[in-house]
């Protein structure tokens, strides 16, 4: 319902059901038609004099915010970020975004060293050397820190030289001397880190048991199970809510990574180690996703093998898993997330296109070249041509590149926050 007042008197009420089909997308636009040198001044609570045109009213909303000519009706608030709901994860909350996700940059030493500054004990850490063509390396607390998964290959977990990762209270230790690509001397490195629960439990919610480490506050869990040799099955994920984004890897060799996201249609998925467009054949999932379980399909892999899932549930002000349509030019699409992003992963679903990964640790300011890494490739960091702006409430593409802004093409993304919109400024 929309109510229109003139000089504090109600003149019209319109309910959504009475509006014409022109408003079916639930947007209402207000317009002023001006002629000649006429001007129009709007007050959304910033100035009850309307830029000195009338005497001040001095009325605030019920939260004590704003300066209105007349007192706003009960339940109606000034249109400003201060009146946004208090996020569960945010500056004035018990927990902050970087208590659950954080990026660290470091320089390899060629010998055992501890990396601090993560801010928590990570349960999933994803490493990439920035200055060389080297495999990605992914470790988690359930599988342990010896054998890395590589997002750019379909191979089984394998050790990086003699490197062993130990998760610590403020980061991780990398032990070993044959550690090129993860801690080689002078290697320029990035590590993206997520916190689960810090420990794991057996979960029997599915048709087969799973080992789960779940952080319900941040909507993230790690799930490991052993798949049957045939048929479909389910495993519990521990989040207590239906997931929005799932990364899956059968741990046997020659088993591709598969990614499902809530905006894909039933039966669709993507390959994290591939550049392929969205697929719907092969059914790596059985597409049973609910508040307790996710589904697998052994017919996809054909063997009884261990499988790992990284499972995410969207949390307002902290994480977002959605899609957008590209516009193909340097004044690119703006994507609203509800927070200032610290990490953004993008994939064009319409064509063969690399995954693109941006973060603010490698790109601390806007108009700085993009600094992309490709999860499906060993490529080193690209620091030009693919710019992105990190804004207070989302991100904006600054390139016409078809991989992440193809004109009229559908792209999915995953994003994690630096600060919620309520407390954020643009870069």
Predicted regions and their residues:
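Surface-exposed molecular-recognition determinants
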Residues: 1-427
């Amino acid at each position: 319902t929309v109510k229109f007042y003139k000089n504090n008197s109600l003149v019209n009420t319109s309910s959504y059901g009475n509006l014409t089909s022109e408003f079916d997308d639930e947007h209402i636009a207000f317009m002023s038609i001006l002629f000649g040198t006429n001007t129009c001044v709007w007050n959304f609570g910033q100035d009850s004099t309307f830029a000195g045109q009338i005497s001040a009213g001095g009325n605030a909303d019920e939260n004590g915010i704003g300066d209105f000519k007349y007192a706003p009706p009960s339940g109606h608030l000034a249109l400003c970020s201060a009146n946004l709901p208090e996020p569960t994860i945010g500056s004035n909350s018990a927990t902050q975004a970087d208590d659950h996700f954080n990026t660290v940059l470091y320089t390899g030493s060629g010998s055992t060293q501890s990396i601090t500054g993560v801010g928590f004990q990570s349960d999933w850490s994803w490493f990439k050397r920035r200055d060389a063509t080297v495999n990605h390396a992914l470790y988690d607390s359930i599988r342990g820190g010896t054998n890395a998964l590589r997002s750019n290959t379909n191979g089984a977990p394998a050790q990086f030289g003699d490197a062993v990762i130990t998760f610590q209270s403020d980061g991780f230790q990398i032990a070993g001397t044959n550690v090129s690509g993860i801690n080689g001397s002078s290697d320029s490195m990035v590590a993206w880190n997520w916190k689960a629960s810090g420990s794991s439990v057996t979960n029997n919610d599915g048709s087969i048991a799973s080992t789960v480490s779940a952080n319900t506050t941040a909507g993230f869990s790690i799930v490991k199970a052993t798949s049957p040799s045939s048929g479909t099955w389910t495993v519990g994920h521990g989040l207590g809510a239906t997931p929005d984004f799932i990364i899956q890897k059968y741990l046997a060799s020659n088993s591709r990574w598969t990614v499902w996201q809530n905006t894909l249609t039933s039966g669709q998925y993507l390959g994290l180690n591939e550049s392929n467009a969205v697929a719907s054949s092969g059914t790596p999932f059985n597409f049973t996703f609910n508040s307790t379980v996710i589904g697998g399909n052994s017919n996809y892999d054909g063997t009884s093998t261990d499988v790992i899932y990284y499972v995410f549930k969207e949390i307002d002000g902290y994480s977002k898993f959605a899609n957008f349509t590209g516009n193909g030019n340097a004044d690119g699409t703006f994507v609203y997330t509800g927070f200032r992003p610290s990490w953004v992963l993008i994939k064009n679903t319409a064509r063969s296109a690399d995954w693109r990964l941006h973060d603010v640790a490698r790109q601390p300011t806007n108009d700085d070249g993009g600094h992309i890494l490709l999860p499906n490739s060993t490529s080193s960091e690209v620091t030009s041509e693919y710019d992105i702006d990190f804004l207070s409430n989302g991100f904006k593409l600054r390139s016409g590149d078809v991989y992440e802004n193809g004109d009229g093409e559908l792209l999915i993304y995953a994003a994690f926050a630096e600060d919620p919109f309520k407390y954020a400024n643009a870069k």
